[in-house]
Design a protein with these regions (language model features):
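Extracytoplasmic/periplasmic substrate-recognition and gating elements
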Residues: 308-384
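Glycine-centered hinge/linker elements that transmit conformational signals in sensory
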Residues: 195-202, 233, 243-277, 317-324
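Extracytoplasmic/periplasmic solute-binding protein
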Residues: 150-160, 165, 192-249, 289
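Hinge/lid segment of periplasmic solute-binding proteins
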Residues: 109-166, 175, 210, 315-323
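Short, polar/charged alpha-helical segment
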Residues: 51-75, 116
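Conserved C-terminal helix/tail region of periplasmic/extracytoplasmic solute-binding proteins
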Residues: 401, 407-491
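Extracytoplasmic "Venus flytrap"/periplasmic binding protein-like
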Residues: 69-142, 177, 290-291, 308-311
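Short, solvent-exposed loop/beta-turn-alpha elements that line the ligand-binding surface or hinge
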Residues: 128-139, 183-187, 213, 218-220, ...
């Protein structure tokens, strides 16, 4: 990292030699005064979009250039890097000045881990001075807070579109279960309610074939286990990785992790929860689960019909709600996901032009158009209302897929408006640690479920098969190992 930092700083020093970097001194209008329609400045914007999303973005760029760009003297040029990982690698190569690397862009869409690396190398511009307090107050607070991760609390990331996690369910096939048990979708208020419902569903489906022991079905699955851990601990009042003076410390609370364990690992090894295909929406399409937690941006992939193992197919409707909290949640927090834009250090004119573009693109008219056509949420409070979503939505509400996407966007708006949009702060090794924690819980659950299934196949009852895995001692051993390995990753 030190070599990388030195290399980047040397390159920036040579690029910016002779350029006077002007401070906005807290005035949001200073930057725009640097622009001259007679001497337009060119800004380069790196994105990772593809397909229809890229087409919509390129049309927005064209619209900007033909309006605000002409008026203020800004020419925006966008380059798609194909995917977010390629963009991150290419961006780091560019600022390091590697042979064959592209020129450093003015703006780039990145995750916070990449922004952290760039900030450590002193390559990012603080966006805060370009905005008035009134302007910043228009955005969902949590979206901006994600971009304030360094010691100076500078605003280094600017949001354009976001997503969250939603709880969805096949309400058509849920109805017979509800009729027999009284457990309706509306009765699920917490994750603990869901865990209890999944146990009942397993027993209910198992009882339908009394001649076959322990063939009950899983009710639920979720895509991101890392999100489950991070948002779960935060809801339960635990900041797992507090950062003080640039140094991260480990704060993994045993009680919080036991709640996570009891509401994912325990139901999973019992067969109440399940995961079979790559994504849980695929499991729902084949009837292997009825409910799932997944990204709001993937609502277009939610099933509109179920095809069973015998190739029979039936249409379904989907229940959509913001993800369920824990019963003891002390913070009404929801996951926020999605890359944001960072401003690379450039000339004062380029920086001013880039911020003008960001402000324009985040205005509800432009932002709603891009967000709705991308399946993501807009970033202002004004745009995150059901009425605003309904007025801007361009999908076909007469189709099940169109209705699913609309319901997901509406539920997301409610989640972001009435909850805390949460994202962890980046630090050295944060990406690897996130991957490790998610795989540690998910992998252990899958491994032990396989052992339980094998034991049942050999003649054990389910209660006998899971007994050794459900003890406090077993959890404590796993948790101690988890903490030790996590500590090693941040040292």
């Amino acid at each position: 990292m030190k070599k990388r930092t030195i290399a980047i700083k040397r390159i920036l020093a040579s690029v910016l030699t002779g350029v006077t970097v002007l401070s906005c001194m807290g005035c949001a209008n200073t930057g725009s005064k640097l622009l001259d329609p007679k001497n337009p400045v060119t800004i380069t914007i790196w994105n990772y979009y593809n397909g229809d999303q890229l087409t919509v973005f390129e049309k927005q760029i064209e619209n900007f250039n033909n309006t605000v760009g002409i008026e203020k003297g800004i020419v925006a040029v966008t380059v798609s890097q194909g995917d977010i990982d390629t963009l991150a690698d290419s961006l780091i190569d560019a600022v390091e000045g590697k042979a064959g690397a592209q020129e450093v862009p003015t703006l780039a869409s990145v995750y916070s881990e990449t922004a952290y690396i760039l900030d450590q190398a002193d390559t990012l511009t603080n966006l805060e001075p370009f905005f008035s307090e009134e302007e910043l107050a228009a955005y969902v607070p949590g979206f901006l807070n994600e971009g304030r991760f360094n010691e100076e609390n500078e605003l280094l990331l600017f949001p354009i579109i976001k997503s969250t996690e939603l709880f969805t369910a096949n309400e058509t096939d849920w109805e017979p279960f509800a009729a027999d048990t009284g457990i309706t979708l509306d009765s699920l208020v917490t994750k603990e309610d869901l865990t209890a419902a999944a146990k009942t569903y397993y027993e209910w489906t198992d009882a339908q074939t009394p001649e076959i022991a322990e063939d009950g079905k899983a009710l639920y699955g979720r895509d991101s286990i890392a999100n489950y851990i991070y948002i779960g601990c935060y809801q339960l009042g635990q900041d797992m990785f507090p950062v003080t003076n640039g140094k991260v410390t480990l704060n993994m609370n045993r009680d919080a992790f036991k709640v996570l364990w009891d509401n994912y690992y325990i139901p999973y090894i019992n067969g109440y929860f399940g995961s079979y295909a790559k994504f849980r929406s695929e499991d729902a399409k084949t009837g292997k689960i009825l409910a799932l937690t997944s990204s709001s941006a993937s609502a277009g992939y939610l099933p509109t019909a179920v095809t069973l193992a015998d190739d029979s197919t039936h249409d379904i409707s989907i229940f959509v709600e913001k993800d369920l909290p824990f019963a003891d949640a002390s913070i009404n927090a929801v996951v926020q996901q999605g890359a944001s834009y960072c401003l690379l250090k450039a000339t004062p004119e380029q920086e001013a032009g880039a911020v003008e573009f960001l402000k324009w693109f985040a205005e509800p008219e432009q932002n709603m158009d891009f967000a709705m056509k991308s399946g993501y949420s807009p970033v202002t409070l004004e745009a995150n209302t059901t009425d605003a979503i309904k007025n801007a939505y361009t999908g076909d509400l007469t189709t099940a897929e169109g209705q699913n996407i609309f319901n997901a966007l509406s539920a997301s708006a409610d989640a972001f408006t009435n909850g805390v949009a949460y994202a962890t702060k980046p630090f050295q090794g944060s990406k690897d640690l996130r991957t490790f924690l998610g795989e540690a819980l998910e992998g252990r659950a899958a491994e032990d479920r396989a052992a339980v299934a094998a034991a049942i196949g050999a003649g054990a009852t389910r209660e006998e098969a899971v007994a050794d895995f459900c003890t406090e001692e077993y959890f404590d051993t796993w948790f101690a190992e988890l903490c030790n390995q996590a500590q090693a990753l941040i040292e």
